[in-house]
């Protein structure tokens, strides 16, 4: 007879154990964690253990802040000792652009209750006396940064979860997953069969293998990431217990951390390598790859100039281990698209910093229906079918190489593109369209038909080279007419005898009359916005919903999970069946009059109305 648990967690790294701990802490103790090897034996055990709160993402900053707070609290438990050092950190700025970024993130941190500060070179030297500062503009100070022993914090959370009644089984491999008509699961392992309501995939770099058990693809790849530990340095030994702050030099792409009387140097180099493209070895627990020190030469030399005591010190050890990456470097949290009771908490490139907060968030999401704060930037459903294995590898390598790069507004990185294109793509490109990507779709960001934009330098100071041509486009849209090709908007048809009642119950805004448009919202019980749609009412029981390109899978879940079971409502995803051409400006009516078989004056000029216009679109042929 099969055993039973409400929730089965697959994976015993810091993310899975944190989820176990937080589920139990919230009162759900009927949880079983299955680990194929030993706890923390995948990517967790060899992690450097840095615990930054810094992030350019509001939601990730919140996740990391909670992790730091949780670890400080757990470190007080004398039964499960944890080596946790809160040293603070300095991030170096070589330019005014970098200082502008630091000031922006400092304001975010202060809004989140953290006392970041921006330092002058002199103030920086006071905090880090071994540092060469003559060519620096300044630095950012994060007082909460530090480092922790990854295996110890994982073991401490596992022990706390067990005390609360949760279960952990090691050396037990999941071999099959089967979902039943009632949306519950049978989890088959090499030792048992377990019936459960919910499966949580927390399998780290093996999360894609778990997805294969349910016949689905996860955009994940494995990166080779290295850090080195130096031999002992007398100047550090002389400092005694006065440990230096963690140092990050983003403009040369490395971190430097005091480890007893030595340094740990962790670069994010341009020559990183995608691993295991043909599959993950069956056995790799607590294992590493051979060192590839040549890849790190530039960062080693730069660090030696920045902190001269590194000098000619020798290298005691190199750690070269596997780290999972999504195409944007962010983890996957939340439900699997179109599938009840299957959840994600995996693919952490910065698992120690994010593991504590991610465990809290996924526990809240599973038990309460939503986490405390918005997590769209790490929602599993942000990536759709276009995120193939090759796309994932290309984008992840690009992200790794730019790990410390400045996050400029309007930056468009080229790797993995194009994926989805409008039928007008080639025509508009020949007319000077410069493209960006939204939800996998190529969209023109501006036009440069005369080749006027020669300076493509990115900036925080509104000095972008495209400002002049964009201003001309805005002037045309305000005073004449502009035609925009905006493909990729999520487009869903809702029809059937129950369609009106279904949408009226799901959406907070009054539904439009036939022939009219409304901007509508699906809300959470606490009033927060879940989805936004523009809805056109085609007939009494037929509606056309338009949503954001990037949220297609999310919005489909919102609609599908609320469908009545009596078959009275039909949903049809027509996102790829129709394009989106926007005609705007005071002279837009004149343009439409030339391409429609219906006189434009027959149509109302009110904003919230629509009509089916039969148009002829003449495309130039080369």
Residue ranges of each PLM-predicted region?
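Beta1/beta-strand and adjacent pyrophosphate-binding region of the FAD-binding site
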Residues: 2-15, 32
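Positively charged, low-complexity/disordered segments
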Residues: 606-622
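C-terminal catalytic lobe of FAD-dependent flavoproteins
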Residues: 251, 260, 282, 286-420
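Flavin (FAD/FMN) cofactor-binding and adjacent substrate-gating region
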Residues: 70-73, 85, 94-170, 175-188, ...
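Glycine-rich FAD pyrophosphate-binding loop
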Residues: 24-44
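Dinucleotide-binding Rossmann-like beta1-alpha1 core, especially the glycine-rich loop
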Residues: 49-127, 251-256, 260-264, 290, ...
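Flavin-dependent oxidoreductases
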Residues: 18, 177-290, 298-306, 391-412, ...
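Glycine/proline-enriched, intrinsically flexible loops and inter-domain linkers
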Residues: 373-374, 378-601, 605, 611
